[in-house]
Amino acid sequence: MTHNKTIKKVYIVGAGPGDPELLTLKAQRVLREADVVIYDALVNPEILQHCKPNAEIIKVGKRRNNHSFSQLQIASLLIDRAKKGERVIRLKGGDPLIFGRLGEEILELFSKNIEIEIIPGITSAFAVAADMKFPLTHRQLGSSITFLTGEEFYEKTTNKLKWERIIWGADTIIVYMILYNLPKIIKKFLSVGYSAEKPIVLVQWASLKKKNFLIGTIGTIIHQVIESKFGPPSLAIIGEVIEISSIIQKL
């Protein structure tokens, strides 16, 4: 194990949406050099094969209602190992900059004078659009995108989302972690006059061979989820750009 008391640095690395081949070259390189890799539950285990044989690999959970480590415990672990001079990686699914609780962890690290380097990953929404062969932007159909989290409903108590502004402020809307609160989210869309005919795609296990898609409308998707027993982890993309996928399939 490499010890260097002057390092005191943590790499926060995006593991991408799941497909190991979508891991960036830089992420692969730092994984090969790491002494300690602290990873989330949604990271594909195949990605850990890039770690050197004697690296310590620690799973910290982070699935809904099943956190093996609290956020504070994770931060403490990162700080402790970095202060020992070990090469530390915090490995997160997707891109850590999008709904990855990055802010909480980097503030803790900075407060202890620990340097960080963030290595972005491919976020799941991009993998979904690539798999289904539609763009997230289009000159006629979608010139703006909004990223939302479906978990905001039950977790946030202040500064709640201004749904009417958000829904009418973007052509394409991407909702991560949508499944648990899907009925509430659909109700919000409809309550501000959003069309029940608006296209939506719901995706589970983006980029992996076991991926699962549901294509429908705002008005039909809840029934489709119930009928198909669709499960997490999943995200939704809403907007007219989805129609390009259907057009391509007909060609």
UniProtKB/Swiss-Prot annotation:
UniProt-listed Pfam families: TP_methylase
Main location: plastid
Gene Ontology biological-process annotations: methylation; siroheme biosynthetic process
Transmembrane segments: none
Signal peptide limits: none
This protein's UniProt keywords: Chloroplast, Cobalamin biosynthesis, Methyltransferase, Plastid, Porphyrin biosynthesis, S-adenosyl-L-methionine, Transferase
GO CC terms, sorted: chloroplast
Residues annotated for S-adenosyl-L-homocysteine binding in this entry: 17, 93-95, 123-124, 177, 206
Catalytic activity: uroporphyrinogen III + 2 S-adenosyl-L-methionine = precorrin-2 + 2 S-adenosyl-L-homocysteine + H(+)
Iron-sulfur recorded as keyword: no
Matches recorded under InterPro entries: 4pyrrol_Mease (IPR000878), 4pyrrol_Methylase_sf (IPR035996), 4pyrrole_Mease_sub1 (IPR014777), 4pyrrole_Mease_sub2 (IPR014776), CobA/CysG_C (IPR006366), Siro_Cobalamin_biosynth (IPR050161), Uropor_MeTrfase_CS (IPR003043)
GO MF annotation list: uroporphyrin-III C-methyltransferase activity
Record carries keyword Hydrolase: no
Pathway: Cofactor biosynthesis; adenosylcobalamin biosynthesis; precorrin-2 from uroporphyrinogen III: step 1/1; Porphyrin-containing compound metabolism; siroheme biosynthesis; precorrin-2 from uroporphyrinogen III: step 1/1
Localization terms from the record: Plastid, Chloroplast
EC class name: transferase
Entry EC no(s): 2.1.1.107
Record's function text: It is a step in the biosynthesis of both cobalamin (vitamin B12) and siroheme.
The protein's name in its UniProt record: Uroporphyrinogen-III C-methyltransferase
Name of encoding gene: cobA
